[in-house]
Design a protein with these regions (language model features):
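Charge-biased, low-complexity intrinsically disordered regions
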Residues: 1-221
């Protein structure tokens, strides 16, 4: 898979760095070991952060700046990483979806980056381009219906949008039948070392909980 970062993104975030993780996997409805890790993370994070200080996490602060620069209110269209951590800090439980989605959510919270997870076999073409959503652009967010993505960073394949930091698209979503996983880590803070560490963490989780073939990743800018 080739990933292109458009001039639109370079204009609002010249320091952007991303990582693309790809792996053959075996998904499951639930994994107890993974949820033990998620619960332990939740207990720790509640002692370290508040709903205000979480905005200072570098990846979250950076994507909020990009939203504002693109004309989007980050408090109305929260980046997924922020929304997930906020939910834990408010004493709520996370939604349990399936092992791959739950695993990606943990990785997103652990590093503060918005991470897109996709069934790679549902992506049309061999290239994804990261740009900015346009007025009236159709986009069906997972569990959200039609989402107004004007001003949001968006990955597009040959057909249209597949992922934003707020919500991925129904068309390319991960299901229990997914065997070919594509994960995109979005480092709007420009911290390449941290983005690479996040990719390595995901590869480790995939081997532990999703029968991964080992997987690979590459960095793109």
């Amino acid at each position: 898979m080739e990933i292109i970062v458009s001039k639109e993104i370079a204009k609002v975030c010249p320091e952007f760095v991303g990582a693309c993780v790809e792996a053959k996997v075996v998904n499951s409805a639930y994994n107890g070991g993974l949820w033990d890790e998620i619960h332990a993370f939740g207990e720790r994070i509640r002692t370290e952060l508040t709903t205000e200080t979480l905005k200072n996490i570098s990846g979250i602060a950076a994507i909020r700046r990009v939203y504002r620069a693109s004309g989007k209110d980050p408090s109305r269209y929260r980046p997924a990483s922020e929304a997930l951590i906020r939910r834990l800090l408010q004493g709520k439980t996370l939604y349990q979806i399936n092992t791959l989605v739950d695993l990606i959510n943990l990785a997103s919270m652990a590093y503060g980056y918005s991470i897109g997870g996709f069934d790679a076999d549902k992506i049309v073409g061999e290239r994804l381009t990261l740009g900015i959503g346009k007025a009236g652009e159709p986009y069906e967010g997972i569990g959200r219906g039609q989402l107004n993505i004007e001003g949001l960073p968006v990955y597009r394949d040959e057909i249209g949008g597949v992922g934003t930091p707020t919500s991925d698209h129904e068309r390319t979503k991960i299901t229990d039948k997914t065997t070919h996983l594509l994960v995109l880590i979005n480092g709007y803070d420009g911290d390449e070392k941290r983005v690479k560490a996040n990719a390595g963490y995901i590869l480790d989780l995939l081997k532990k909980y999703a029968g991964s073939d080992g997987g690979t990743f590459f960095v793109y800018k």
